[in-house]
Amino acid sequence: MQRRAFLAGGIALAATPAISGTLTVDGGTITIDLRGDPPPGFAMLAENWVRKSAAAVALYYGRFPVPELAVRLIVGQDGGVHGGQTFPGDVPAIRIRVGGRSDPADLLVKDWVMVHEMVHLAFPWLDLQHNWMAEGLAVYVESIARVQAGHIRPQQAWGDFVKMMPRGLPHDGDGGFEATLSHGRTYWGGAMFCLLADIRIRQYTDNRLGLQQALRGINAVRDFRRQWDFEETLAIGDRATGTHALRDQYMEMKDQPVTPDLDALWHGLGVMARDGGIAFDRNARLAAVREAIETPVS
């Protein structure tokens, strides 16, 4: 989750850290500050958590998205991860609330929040009108990046999409993405936009390129340190793939509500609900597209 009214948060971030350390991941230097009352051994667990998450994001984008990052962990007395925020600036900052009683599985296996917040770093800081893209992109890329890094199985990511993306469909009276700012439309509607764009790019390029290459092209010249024009940013992504996929889809969906047939989409991708889980049909029409989305790019 991004913060646009971040002055108060910036004041909180300036508090004296309890423990701090630095690590480097694929071109990025990350400072980790622990605040609160972290128990013995928690600093090492936190470092492993940040490093593993950063490596997944770097794998997806080809490098870590920004040269410097400050990670502030507010350590409480419980367990688990309780949400995060990403702040723009010359040195972007991520603030996450986490329980000091978290075990390695909580942070290294179950958590998705750290990767989600780091994905924000690879795209320009956007105004509220385009928050659906910022959050939807983080939802979508976080899932695919974790699959490509081997953190989760593809069945988990696609199962989440099948279960949650219907929340992103427009309701009666809704407008396009720029007019309806509900939680479901912002997070899961935005993620649906990204999946559809990924498929569209791959259809335009005979499955040679996808959204991942478009986003790498954007991150090569822009990132979360600055606010940039949204349509210009999409044009950069389109140039990276030699298509107009992002622009065309944005123009189709920004003002008018569009209701894709998700059941037909899953069928085409070969994603099938079976026995309480997800199975894949490798003979489906778009099965090769789904497999390409899941596969790391060199």
Stretches with model-predicted labels:
Residues 129-198, 202-212, 216, 220-226:
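Acidic/His/Gly-enriched intrinsically disordered linker/tail segments
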Residues 56-63, 121, 141-148, 196, ...:
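Structured segments of extracytoplasmic/periplasmic soluble domains
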Residues 23-126, 130:
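Juxtacatalytic substrate-recognition/specificity segment
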